[in-house]
UniProtKB/Swiss-Prot annotation:
Gene3D superfamilies: ACT-like. Chain A, domain 2, Met repressor-like
Organism: Methanocaldococcus jannaschii (strain ATCC 43067 / DSM 2661 / JAL-1 / JCM 10045 / NBRC 100440) (Methanococcus jannaschii)
Superkingdom, natural source: Archaea
A GO BP entry: regulation of DNA-templated transcription
Protein name (Swiss-Prot/TrEMBL): Uncharacterized transcriptional regulator MJ0080
Amino acid sequence: MERISLTIEKNLLKEVDEIINKERISRSEFIRRALEYYVKKYDWLSRIESKIGEITVIYNSKAVEDIVKLESQYKDIVIISLEIPFEGKIIRMIAIKGQRDRIIEFTNKLKGISSVELAQLTTISIE
């Protein structure tokens, strides 16, 4: 195995430490698992052209206008979206269907909106 050095935000490290204490694993094992998950997900996403899925977005009310505008720009892949207020934030579930690159582009633009805390893509392949 190779050794690497890593610099992360203090808050993120605190969250990692909470997880590793619950899971009873080392930081190294946690990071190894996270990297394996990311690589597998990236590899899987890169091999499939057409997808159907859902994007979960968590944000505050400042982002509503930007998200609605972005959805209209991607109406070729957005099937429907549902907005749910929850504990002072908004959770939006966006059903999507289309080409992989277009979906990834849309997801990345959602992530780029300043008031968006999370934009998580979940997809399945269309055979």
